UniProtKB/Swiss-Prot annotation:
Molecular function GO labels: signaling receptor activity
Name this polypeptide is given: Tumor necrosis factor receptor superfamily member 9
Keyword annotations: Cell membrane, Disulfide bond, Glycoprotein, Membrane, Receptor, Repeat, Signal, Transmembrane, Transmembrane helix
Residue numbers spanned by region Interaction with LRR-1: 214-255
TNFR-Cys repeats: 24-45, 47-86, 87-118, 119-159
InterPro entries: Growth_fac_rcpt_cys_sf, TNFR/NGFR_Cys_rich_reg, TNFR_9, TNFRSF9_N
Residues spanning the signal sequence: 1-23
Membrane-topology annotation of the record: Single-pass type I membrane protein
Gene3D superfamilies assigned to the protein according to its UniProt record, in alphabetical order: Tumor Necrosis Factor Receptor, subunit A, domain 2
Disulphide linkage map: 28-37, 31-45, 48-62, 65-78, 68-86, 88-94, 99-106, 102-117, 121-133, 139-158
Designated gene of the protein: TNFRSF9
Length: 255
């Protein structure tokens, strides 16, 4: 018992003596984090200059702080004991340790290529804003059937195969495909009625205009012919004129 205690005490003394000797041989080991051992000042611990840091003690130099620029934004400012932390601006996501790179986000149903975001090919899907397009699940490999068809944003939904369904059980049918955007029958009927009304109104207007123009033309023709019409004398006027003679001829009759 006494020997074991003696051995423990001796070991502790050796460790303490080793640390003391090491500190005497390398005074830079006493420099804490946030400082560096300045050889130009007789190995005195000097604080790290601005925009630099030392995360561990005993460093002879300080590391340059990271600058968050471009697609990066600062999540944590740099201090004398820790580096700055960056993340990506909206529309991008981090890649690598410590967010060393930023990658563009894509919409669901797309994947990022060298030329930018591209829609997933038929038979593949991507339900996230990052990553690659993955193939639809092959339901037949598991002896199942497709209940809901897959899209570029969603995987297929598998269900029991038709052989597994009992005769009295109701089969599940896939949902009806979404109708392509277009005109509803009500809107088409409305436009047809509106077009028919407009055509009838136009036909009535043209007929009325043609009638008015025709009447006006006859009246104008009559007015134009009035100055050129010769007045016709009555029978009494012609008889009265035939009975009158000049005075000289009347005088010559008295013989």
């Amino acid at each position: 018992m006494g020997n074991s205690c003696y051995n423990i005490v001796a070991t502790l003394l050796l460790v303490l003596n080793f640390e003391r000797t090491r500190s005497l041989q390398d005074p830079c080991s006493n420099c804490p984090a946030g400082t560096f051992c300045d050889n130009n000042r007789n190995q005195i611990c000097s604080p790290c200059p601005p925009n630099s840091f030392s995360s561990a003690g005993g460093q002879r130099t300080c590391d340059i702080c990271r600058q968050c620029k471009g697609v990066f934004r600062t999540r944590k400012e740099c201090s004398s004991t820790s580096n700055a932390e960056c993340d990506c601006t909206p529309g991008f996501h981090c890649l690598g340790a410590g967010c060393s790179m930023c990658e563009q986000d894509c919409k669901q149903g797309q994947e990022l290529t060298k030329k930018g975001c591209k829609d997933c090919c038929f038979g593949t899907f991507n339900d996230q804003k990052r990553g690659i397009c993955r193939p639809w699940t092959n339901c037949s490999l598991d002896g199942k059937s497709v209940l809901v068809n897959g899209t570029k944003e969603r995987d297929v939904v598998c269900g029991p195969s038709p052989a597994d369904l009992s005769p009295g059980a109701s089969s599940v049918t896939p949902p009806a495909p979404a109708r392509e955007p277009g005109h509803s029958p009500q809107i088409i009927s409305f436009f047809l009625a509106l077009t028919s009304t407009a055509l009838l109104f136009l036909l009535f207007f043209l007929t009325l205009r043609f009638s008015v123009v025709k009447r006006g033309r006859k009246k104008l023709l009559y007015i134009f012919k009035q100055p050129f019409m010769r007045p016709v004398q009555t029978t009494q006027e012609e008889d009265g004129c035939s009975c009158r003679f000049p005075e000289e001829e009347e005088g010559g009759c008295e013989l």
